[in-house]
Every structure is written in C-alpha cells, then in structure tokens.
Amino acid sequence: GMTSLKELDCSHLSLRSLNVSGCTALEKLYSSGNWLDRLDVSGLSNLRELSCSDNREILNRPGKVARDPGDVYDDGITELNISGCTSLEILTINDNGIPALDLSQCTSLTYLDCSNNDIASLNVSMLSELETLRCDENKLTSLQVSGLSKLKALNCQYMKSLSSLDISNCPAL
C-alpha cells in the first residue's frame, strides 16, 4: 500500500469501491459524494478525520451526480468499519444507510455527524471529548448524552422514533 500517504481526497469521483488498507500513515480521508456501499478503515490508527457522507447513487437517472427533487437513491454506505481508529477526531458520515455505529475505540472524537442514516442505537457515553453531535434523521428510540462535559452542540431533530432524551450533566450545552 501507500504507506506514507497522509491525506487522500477522492470525493465526487463516482467510485464504487475504495481500498485503503495498508495506508497506515493516513490522517485524513475524504470520500464523500461517491457511490460506495461499504468502507473499511479499520486499523488506521493515525486517521484523524474521515468524511464519507452522501454516497447514495441516483437510481432513476443512472450516472447523474447533480441532485434533483424527486430523485430516488440507493442506501449509500451500509457497512462502515472504524475499529482501531483510535485517533479519529472528526467523523462525517451523514446521508448514507448506515444501520449501526460502533464508536467504542474512537474515544478522541470531537465532532460526529451521522445524520440521515438508519441508526437505531447509538452509544456515545465514552466520547468524553465530543463537542458536536449531529444525529438527526435516524431511527433512535433513546439518546443518552449525559455527562459529556464538552458537548456544545446537539442536533437530534426529525426522529419520530425518539422517546427518551437525557442531556443531564452537559454544562457546555
């Protein structure tokens, strides 16, 4: 692999697959606006920023990238593996079809945007550095952000499924 590569921007290229295994020095990866259905960045312990938002392909107008009202999309990324990404600080994965998100090894996160996915359960309790959480338009039934002392911004709107919200002990909110 490209063992010394530190930054890769491959956004808006109509990519259907992306293999970054072996890119162990990678610190920033931008792959938004492609047609990926899975992304594996596991073990990239130097990765600080990952942006892979909006990888949905327009189905009713194949090959088109410009968005029109009424377009029909696939789910975009439905499999995301970020295990071992212990340096990750910024994670932007909005507008995909991600059903679950394991953040247990991403304890350095300060910014998380996972809005407009299919996430039904989200554990952020270990994210003590988190300042911004955008998780709107998901399938969460409960959200507990209590005790996240650095959390300044929380966006959790447009979730009819949400019946429980705990924002206690968040002095920065």
Language model regions located:
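Canonical leucine-rich repeat
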Residues: 8, 18, 39-41, 60-61, ...
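Leucine-rich repeat
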Residues: 2-4, 23-26, 44-47, 85-88, ...
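Intrinsically disordered, low-complexity Ser/Thr- and acidic-rich flexible linkers and loops
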Residues: 55-76
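Consensus "Asn ladder" position of solenoid repeat domains
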Residues: 13, 34, 55, 75, ...
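Conserved hydrophobic beta-strand positions in leucine-rich repeat
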Residues: 6-10, 18, 27-31, 50-52, ...
